[in-house]
Amino acid sequence: MNRLIVKYAGYSVNKAYVAVDGQTLKFGKNGECAFETEKSAVTVSVFNVLEAASASYYLWSILYFFISIFGIFDSYRDFKCRKIEAEFIVRLSGETRVTVRNRAFNKKGESEAVSIECDCGYEVVKNTQYIDKPAKRRTRIMTAVRIVLFIGVIVLIAVIAGNL
């Protein structure tokens, strides 16, 4: 039985998921997770899911805008829409430790998404991060809509207060 111990050290902005052979890992408080398998090699994937990439983004964004009292108590979102796609084939022998670290984003274009440190050998299948253009466009449109809604609410409050 081979054992893979994965440690993920990443920026919280990226909110990336780590999966081994398609099974998403849940990390403990120490940032490590163990995965046991009979295979001699496993596929480690690192990816993120952008909120703005979903088809219902506009609906949910408007709903959260009103629930969060017109955006005042809204949670932080990555408005830069950075997409992470990395996949590695890691060869196992006994207990293998893998550390996955996020890399800084290169503004000039595509860059490596993560760096990996491994006790045994590994092979890079893909390792890119880039800006998701459709998600970025949706984010810009929604930001403009939120600004217009916020100004509309302030005008509505002013009109109601003026009539009293």
Set out the residue ranges of the language-model regions:
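Short loop/turn and low-complexity linker motifs enriched in small/turn-promoting residues
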Residues: 1-164
